[in-house]
Amino acid sequence: MERATILRSLVASGTDTAPWRLVELAAELGIPAADLLVVAGHPVPAELLPPERDADVMRQFAYRVSHCDHAQLAALEAFVRSLPRVTAPGPPVRPAWPYPRPAETRFAATLSGLIGNRGFTIRELPFLGLSLSTLYGMVWRWEPNRYRRQQLRAVAGPLGWALPDLFAVADESYSAELRPMVHCHHLGRVFTAAVPLTTAQLIETAKEADRRSVRADHGAWQPVSQGFAGECPDFP
């Protein structure tokens, strides 16, 4: 069965699939288990979620990593995976809903879940080429609209999702000429690898990102990263 067909079927009737089978399927598809549980409409066990971390540190981490090109991202991902896994001092805690309004559509809830699986809220994401009001609308009631494919192209990369897969979950048609908007999934791979990291380890990783990207500080004004999607080796 094609990946797109599997993902669409999970959106339609994923609650009929046992969580253990979804974890197996996630490994087969190369998708984080927490993400596939969200897609299928299952709750994510707290042990699959990131530990509680400082939001300002998360924002700085995402910002600094977004300035790395593809070679630097690959090295940074290896750096993240080399860090020791630190056991949280207490039991895992599922975070409260982080937005002013609850999600009113299935895909809005899915998007919020995918973002939350990485320990982010809208505020911690790097520059995506979309306004904050648009992003908040997407986690409120993201319905089909004329800009939806553009919005999918913007969010897929930081989530570490391939465009065809996220398009399938959104039940949008995908064509091979579509490209990520600002960031490709190589940035999202670092964010996904960093899910288990503590606040201190995120600070360490952000410093390593600066060292590799040679990003310069500009005082109070900090220019956003324009991304490296145009150089993604997956889109020759």
What are these model-derived regions, one by one?
Residues 1-14, 86-121:
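A short, Lys/Arg-rich alpha-helix, primarily the initiator
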Residues 3-4, 33, 122, 132-133, ...:
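The DNA-contacting recognition helix of HTH DNA-binding domains
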Residues 26, 115, 125-126, 156:
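The alpha-helix within a helix-turn-helix
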Residues 30, 119, 129-130, 160:
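Central "turn" residue of the DNA-binding helix-turn-helix
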Residues 44-102, 174-236:
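Interfacial/linker helices and their anchor residues that mediate assembly or domain coupling
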